[in-house]
From Swiss-Prot:
It comes from Sulfurimonas denitrificans (strain ATCC 33889 / DSM 1251). This is Small ribosomal subunit protein uS15. GO terms for biological process: translation. It holds the Pfam family Ribosomal_S15. SUPFAM superfamilies: S15/NS1 RNA-binding domain. GO terms for cellular component: cytosolic small ribosomal subunit. Transmembrane segments: none annotated. SMART domains: Ribosomal_S15. Belongs to the universal ribosomal protein uS15 family. Keywords: Ribonucleoprotein, Ribosomal protein, RNA-binding, rRNA-binding. Part of the 30S ribosomal subunit. Forms a bridge to the 50S subunit in the 70S ribosome, contacting the 23S rRNA. One of its GO terms (molecular function) is structural constituent of ribosome.
Length: 91
């Protein structure tokens, strides 16, 4: 489930350090969080979509690794990002 370019640009401008900052950890975590929430809603409707479920697990693992790195790098910004995205700090 890909994000449309307008929604992706909105997330990049909200969480990025610059207008075209797509590589920073904050932006990557925010984009993954949006994709995870969209895929979770999809799986609530289509319960037997096992291929998408495996993709969801892959995205969650990727986000977990990025969050672990970001927490080590800048703990204050990490805590702010977690609060803003509304996700748990269980790393």
């Amino acid at each position: 489930m890909a994000l449309d370019s307008a929604k992706k640009q909105e997330i990049v401008t909200k969480f990025g350090r610059g207008e075209n900052d797509t590589g920073s950890s904050e932006v990557q975590i925010a984009l993954l969080t949006k994709r995870i929430s969209d895929l979770t809603e999809h799986l609530k409707v289509f319960k037997k979509d096992h291929a998408s479920r495996l993709g969801l697990l892959k995205l969650v693992g990727q986000r977990r690794r990025l969050m672990r790195y970001f927490k080590r790098k800048d703990k204050d910004a990490y805590l702010k990002l977690v609060a803003e995205l509304g996700i748990r700090d269980n790393i």
